[in-house]
Amino acid sequence: TEYALIDLNFLGVYDLLLLRGDVKTLEAGQKTDIYHEHATDLQQQVNDFNKGIAIDGSAFEANETPFSYGMACYPEKHEEAPNMDSDIFYLKEKVKNGADYLVTQMFFDNEKYYAFVDRCRAEGITVPIIPGIKPIVFKNQLTVLPKIFRSDIPEPFATELRKCKTDDEAKAVGVEWCIQQCKE
């Protein structure tokens, strides 16, 4: 990630979305210069880089970097969090340590997003929380997306998707649902 930060700074890209990613191949606790066990580890690397400190702890010759960034949040709880209280605790840490905004994992039920934002505000999280809206465009996403992203699909939406005979029909239903989410 250090080389990516150098390149982004050189290119004038200063606003980042920091995501750990879904790497499942490394053992828990294993850390490399291209992978962090937690997004907060990546956050610390960017914060250090902004102060002119390299990943090995040494100072580097270039000027301090001006990166600002957002981080992920999960209206339906991160799959690795034992409960929502724990998830909110770490979310507060992300904001306390410099996250300028948050972007949610995709969701299909706006009520869950609204409840999540209300909970965040009650816990003192005041940065913008940008909703992650994604249309379903393939029939198989009805079963695949909930398994991969732990996002519930509301029954009225699932019922309409089950009626679809083709991916084109599923896409039309998915895009319409997404439009209605955005309008709401």
Stretches with model-predicted labels:
Residues 95-102, 124-125, 184:
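Short, surface-exposed connector motifs at secondary-structure boundaries
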Residues 17-19, 100-109, 174:
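Catalytic beta/alpha-barrel core
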Residues 8, 94, 98, 131:
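Conserved, mostly hydrophobic/aromatic
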Residues 20-23, 74, 107, 134-135:
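Short, ordered loop/turn segments at secondary-structure junctions
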Residues 33-66, 70-80, 87, 122-177:
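Active-site pocket-lining/capping segments in soluble small-molecule metabolic enzymes
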Residues 1-9, 85-90, 115-121, 138-144:
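Catalytic cores of alpha/beta
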Residues 2-44:
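Flexible, glycine-rich active-site loops centered on histidine and acidic residues
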